[in-house]
């Protein structure tokens, strides 16, 4: 059997640069982020563009210091790890402080948002089961603008 991806290591230096470049494009007035102050990189198979794993999506998100993501909800569950930084996250009606090393879960169709502290960016590693719901043609995302 072939591995899901020929790339066995996704280097932080490359991920960090991609996130920083997206935010730099935003600073120059160009589109490059998911929303103001919120950049993301999806880890993919470089030969196919598909997710690294057939049933799991992996991403790294960066929220600029003092910035916040838009509130969104989607079909499928996600697990986040705070890779670096600190801030607050809101899942459903519950809000709490997070810092480096913390893990939190966002259940299916629960509203979610994250805000970075004023002291620095908030880097979040996310994995989700979105590819399963996409294959079933039942993946939905709702973003509050």
Task: Give each language-model segment a name.
Residues 40-42, 58-62, 79, 95, ...:
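Conserved hydrophobic/aromatic beta-strand scaffold that supports enzyme active sites
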Residues 1-55, 59, 139-145:
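A short, N-terminal "cap"/entry segment at the start of jelly-roll beta-barrel domains
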Residues 52-53, 68-74, 115-116:
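Short histidine-centered beta-strand/loop micro-motifs
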Residues 80, 119-140:
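A short hydrophobic beta-strand segment most commonly corresponding to one strand
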Residues 91, 98-118, 124-130:
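Conserved metal-binding segment of the jelly-roll/cupin
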Residues 54-57, 76, 108:
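Exposed loop/turn and edge beta-strand positions of beta-sandwich/beta-sheet ligand-binding modules
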């Amino acid at each position: 059997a072939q591995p899901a991806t020929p790339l066995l290591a996704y280097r932080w230096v490359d991920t960090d640069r991609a996130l920083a470049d997206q935010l730099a494009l935003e600073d120059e007035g160009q589109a490059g982020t998911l929303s103001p102050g919120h950049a993301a990189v999806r880890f993919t198979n470089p030969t196919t563009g598909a997710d690294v794993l057939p049933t799991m999506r992996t991403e790294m998100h960066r929220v600029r210091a003092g910035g916040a993501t838009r509130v969104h909800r989607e079909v499928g569950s996600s697990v986040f790890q705070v890779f670096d930084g600190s801030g607050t996250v809101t899942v459903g009606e519950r809000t709490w402080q997070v810092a480096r090393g913390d893990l939190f879960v966002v259940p299916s169709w629960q509203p979610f948002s994250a805000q970075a502290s004023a002291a620095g960016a908030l880097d979040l590693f996310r994995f989700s089961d979105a590819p399963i719901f996409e294959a079933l043609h039942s993946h939905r995302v709702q973003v509050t603008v």
